């Protein structure tokens, strides 16, 4: 997908991306000379990316320290309350650890396996560069309400990822890091 987007979106373009979560496409485009404003309406997702952007080495050291000590039962307990921790760096670290250990890719739900997060991934955070990448917290309940904040942009990007489109979406449990999309 990144290769195709690089082909379609010229260098030095400005992109407003919505539904920021794992940042794969956004960071890839930013690395290849596109300015990316990555929107999310989830405060905990924004906090992770902002913490990574501002002090990646410190955040990586917290993640490394916690990951070595946390057990699987403790991680399952954290899935329910990680977003309630007062310390921003702790929340950001839990977000990263849980989302990388989860088979769903979400911090707030999924089956957990510590082998999904290898030390190489954590070490790569220490060398993280986020030039041309700007996380933006749209403080709206609905994620697409943030479209009105996308100013002076050449392209809009909607990497919605996996989603279920069925009659049983209403009432489905979602975590503080998960976006619910109304497909009606």
Residue ranges, per PLM feature:
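SAM cofactor-binding core of SAM-dependent methyltransferases
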Residues: 2-4, 8-80
């Amino acid at each position: 997908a990144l290769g195709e987007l690089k082909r379609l979106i010229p260098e030095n373009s400005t992109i407003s991306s919505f539904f920021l979560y794992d940042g794969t496409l956004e960071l890839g485009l930013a690395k290849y000379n596109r300015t990316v404003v990555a929107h999310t309406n989830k405060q905990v997702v924004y906090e992770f990316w902002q913490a990574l952007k501002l002090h990646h080495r410190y955040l990586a050291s917290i993640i490394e320290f916690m990951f070595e000590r946390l057990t699987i039962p403790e991680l399952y307990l954290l899935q329910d309350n990680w977003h309630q921790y007062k310390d921003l760096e702790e929340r950001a670290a839990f977000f990263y650890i849980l989302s990388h250990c989860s088979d769903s890719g979400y911090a707030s739900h999924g089956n957990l396996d510590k082998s999904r997060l290898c030390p190489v991934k954590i070490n790569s955070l220490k060398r993280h560069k986020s030039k041309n990448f700007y996380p933006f917290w749209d403080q709206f309940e609905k994620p697409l309400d943030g479209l009105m904040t996308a100013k002076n942009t050449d392209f809009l990007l909607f990497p919605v990822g996996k989603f279920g489109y069925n009659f049983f979406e209403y009432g489905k449990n979602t975590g503080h890091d998960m976006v619910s999309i109304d497909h009606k």
